[in-house]
Amino acid sequence: MQHSDTLITHVDHRRLRSLLDQDSPTEQENVAALRQRLRGARVVSPSRIPRNVVTMNSQVVLRNLDSGDRMTCTLAYPSEARASRRHVAVTRPLGTAMLGKRVGQIIRWPGGARERRLRIQSVPYQPEAAGAMNL
């Protein structure tokens, strides 16, 4: 079954499938969720992905719906994720929740003792919109 609200470029889909096929022990707790996200996503050409969709290496502004706090982060591959640069690995629960979602959508992910609810406020940088189709 496809999740109509999840769009992924064929480049991201291929790279993420390859990453999951490596069966690395890192981030194992969320691998099943990421596999499910990939299975249900609608896969499109990088040139056809809307500018408001979170793709790999996108910079994303999120608003916490409970506290009102805003945070900016970049969705990254695990090997490229650096906390000091506010990168979120796609293999982490927040990263998987953001992947393929659009501006305005609410994402939910486990955070501490309770579920967190974040709204995607904007995508200031998306590689595909910037012409970087293979990032």
Model segments located where?
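N-terminal intrinsically disordered, low-complexity, charge/repeat-rich segments that act as generic
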Residues: M1-R51
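Intrinsic-disorder/low-complexity coil detector
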Residues: S24, I49, W109, V123-Q126
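Generic detector of short, locally flexible boundary/turn motifs and exposed helical patches
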Residues: Q22-E29, R37-G40, M71-L75, R82-H87, ...
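Weak global preference for isoleucine
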Residues: I8, I49, I106-I107, I120
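Non-DNA-binding regulatory cores of transcription-related proteins
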Residues: M56-V61, D66-R117, P124
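Peptidyl-prolyl cis-trans isomerase
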Residues: R48-Q59, E128
